[in-house]
């Protein structure tokens, strides 16, 4: 019996030593220099659960804020199963973006990479990323918007708002989503049968950002399941259409044509799966991000009468100077006569922080501010920490479009990262600005509007309206 007890004690002692070493290695990862301060959290899960702590519209993530106060503008952690260095200071972030495609490359934590596959076109960088951007801009860039899309965006927006007038309250975000899907879907995939387009649109509309929350909540698991089902159905519709188009050789002048042509080149970048995923992503991102920003702009304007009055003056002047009473918004009006509108859009984008975190990966050991970021570690850039920094923006939690007066309104900077950073700027930036501008134009020139009820805007960490943004509109007298 004493032998058994001795053996048990020996096993427990060895296990304790092994576990202690494992815990020490987890808390103190290997590094060829000095790691940034911070904590790696619990083994395996790290600090992922803390990362998902919900917070309000006018707040930086509590996860980030607590650690900034404790460790400073850069710190280490482990989220989503990846060792990560978090950056919150503009100069440090700029240095990372300056070294893009050299010491840092675009990447996501491994937990995000595995479900989509390492060969997914969205995870590529360098020349492949440039090519993806180039062909996307052929259909969503300024020239395409000017020549092929602005008229349809204007018509669909006008008709949709007219159908909502004097009919009680409706969700502003859903309204913008419907507008986007109505005019964008035919540009991406044209000549769909009505029932096929309805199926695709319904499943794209079911894909929101509510699923990206704490995995410990039952509602999150339910949302993830619904998103998985909707995504599967949407991808199947796109795949079926892609297969038929490829077999028929029919040319429709849409984005799908471009994808079919890309798949037939000798140096293939887009296989069928990549092409289908790109089409899917364009529809989802355009619908989700643009509708959220437009809705938030409506909320801010409804609560800020001074800004709304200035916006109405600007758009009344556009109507007064327009040739042709029934004409829609022209490219000239959009680009050169909507200065205050773009100030409102910039301020909304700054406060919305639709991309609360941007990822890169160190390809070699990199020294920044006396600390070493080890090769293979993820770098997480936190735009809200910059956009809500009172050393950069006076009264940063106040909606103030006039802060953009006299400034460049259409380009990003190291203190304004609403459409990405470094070489990876969002290809849909101009599309988003155009859609928001046209929606605002018709809203303020034709209707009186008000919030139907108080609506909460939550970040968890992606921003969304849990109960939508109900508004009422009526024909202006």
UniProtKB/Swiss-Prot annotation:
GO terms for molecular function: heme binding; iron ion binding; monooxygenase activity; oxidoreductase activity, acting on paired donors, with incorporation or reduction of molecular oxygen. It is an enzyme of class 1 (oxidoreductase). InterPro entries: Cyt_P450 (IPR001128), Cyt_P450_CS (IPR017972), Cyt_P450_E_grp-IV (IPR002403), Cyt_P450_sf (IPR036396). Pfam families: p450. SUPFAM superfamilies: Cytochrome P450. It is a single-pass membrane protein. The keyword Oxidoreductase applies. One of its GO terms (cellular component) is membrane. It is found in: Membrane. Heme binds at residue 426. PROSITE patterns: CYTOCHROME_P450. Keywords: Heme, Iron, Membrane, Metal-binding, Monooxygenase, Oxidoreductase, Transmembrane, Transmembrane helix. Disruption phenotype: Increased levels of thalianol in roots. The chain crosses the membrane at residues 3-23. Expressed primarily in the root epidermis. Its EC number is 1.14.-.-. Its cofactor is heme. It comes from the Eukaryota. Constitutes with three contiguous genes an operon-like gene cluster that is involved in the thalianol pathway. Hydroxylates thalianol into thalian-diol. Belongs to the cytochrome P450 family. This is Cytochrome P450 708A2. It comes from Arabidopsis thaliana (Mouse-ear cress). The lineage of its organism: Eukaryota, Viridiplantae, Streptophyta, Embryophyta, Tracheophyta.
